[in-house]
Amino acid sequence: MEGIDLGNAFAQSLSGLGVPADVARALWLPLPMIVILLTVTVGVIAAVWGERKWSGMMQQRMGPTIIGLGGSIQGAADGVKLLVKEDIIPVKADPWLFTLGPAIVIIPVFFSYLVIPFGQGLVLSDITIGIFFIIAVASISPIGALMAGYASNNKYALLGGLRAAAQSISYEIPLALSVLAIVMMSSSLSTVDIVEQQETLGLFSFFSWNIWRQPIGFVIFLISALAETERAPFDLPEAESELVAGHHTEYTGMKFALFYLSEYANLILASLIASVLFLGGWSFIVPLEPLAALFGIEASNPIFQVVNALVGISVTILKATFFVFLAILARWTLPRVRIDQLLDLGWKFLLPVSLFNLLLTAALVLLSNTLKTTLPLYLPLIIFVGLVFVAMSLQKRPAAKPTAARA
């Protein structure tokens, strides 16, 4: 099923009301970014509340409880607080670069949401190079972080900016290679096509999700995405014990809020991309269309289309929430790594493994096309399970302490 062109649908709806076609298309232009801005802002508020609550549960405390029902609008209150705080620019800072830094960090994140499908036919822009667009746009944000660190005229901020740039470059390559393996299997760069490729087994589409075909790529993507979003244990650019607050040490007010917003917007974006690439996007464990066909319900039924759209949106959000929870869990269970360990992990381990995974995927796709079956694509799952089993078998167990002899 092809995605709906929301732009043309919007223009046709207004044209039916007597609005000129050119005016209707002009009215559509700002709407996608407005929708994204509102959606991401609400998502960030929910993510901040969820992280504070889950963090409180892990530490056996309550978390926010005062502002709103159960502290649900604590994030919005913090945003208003930052909005009205004084905007200070250090005397010796470069005012132009200091101001542009936060904007260059946050703007590419919003553009990336344009190609994320939230449901079947619910994507603002289904361009044929969607995944390539996300990777290309995401590479702009480190420039803003480096610019902010340099313009602050602060040694800690500069070191934070340099760390952010080095970390981003180190992990963009393994992340891109893990995504490229998915692209090879689906033969498309479109995010919608990648999701639809994971629905090829009808009622058993759960087993066609890419997580079963690309377990190695999935682990590489998770680690790389965590590093790209600068979340613990990879929060080296703003390590409080070393760099105060990294490249946003000198920022206050709304400029600081933009950095804060970009961190959680990046986390949500990475979670959505992971759900689209590896967990079937809007696909439920049992797809609704084949299930409805068993009961004689046609896919063109308006009620079914509404239910299918709502289920798709809910499933996408739930899958993304699962990845956000994993990121929060990693923050409170794993210690922060050193900068040399971070770079070694990216260049000496993830990069070779991602290259191996890409070459293996290419060979299996060729074999699958030759044999006219998708069974060879599940070989990485067997390899991954075998490696996990070997690693667990070789794990050193502490020697038992000798029991003291009784007198």
Curated annotation (Swiss-Prot):
InterPro entries, sorted: NADH_UbQ_OxRdtase_su1/FPO, NADH_UbQ_OxRdtase_su1_CS
Location of this chain's protein in the cell: Cell inner membrane
S-adenosyl-L-methionine is among the record's keywords: no
Molecular function terms, GO-annotated: oxidoreductase activity, acting on NAD(P)H, quinone or similar compound as acceptor; quinone binding
Reaction(s) catalysed by this chain's protein: a plastoquinone + NADH + (n+1) H(+)(in) = a plastoquinol + NAD(+) + n H(+)(out); a plastoquinone + NADPH + (n+1) H(+)(in) = a plastoquinol + NADP(+) + n H(+)(out)
Transmembrane domains' residue ranges: 28-48, 96-116, 127-147, 175-195, 203-223, 267-287, 309-329, 347-367, 374-394
EC number(s) reported in the record: 7.1.1.-
Annotated membrane topology: Multi-pass membrane protein
Domain of life, source organism: Bacteria
Keyword NADP in record: yes
GO cellular component, one term: plasma membrane
One BP annotation, GO: aerobic respiration
The entry's keywords: Cell inner membrane, Cell membrane, Membrane, NAD, NADP, Plastoquinone, Quinone, Translocase, Transmembrane, Transmembrane helix
Subunit structure: NDH-1 is composed of at least 11 different subunits.
Function: NDH-1 shuttles electrons from an unknown electron donor, via FMN and iron-sulfur (Fe-S) centers, to quinones in the respiratory and/or the photosynthetic chain. The immediate electron acceptor for the enzyme in this species is believed to be plastoquinone. Couples the redox reaction to proton translocation, and thus conserves the redox energy in a proton gradient.
Protein family per UniProt: Belongs to the complex I subunit 1 family.
Name recorded for this polypeptide: NAD(P)H-quinone oxidoreductase subunit 1
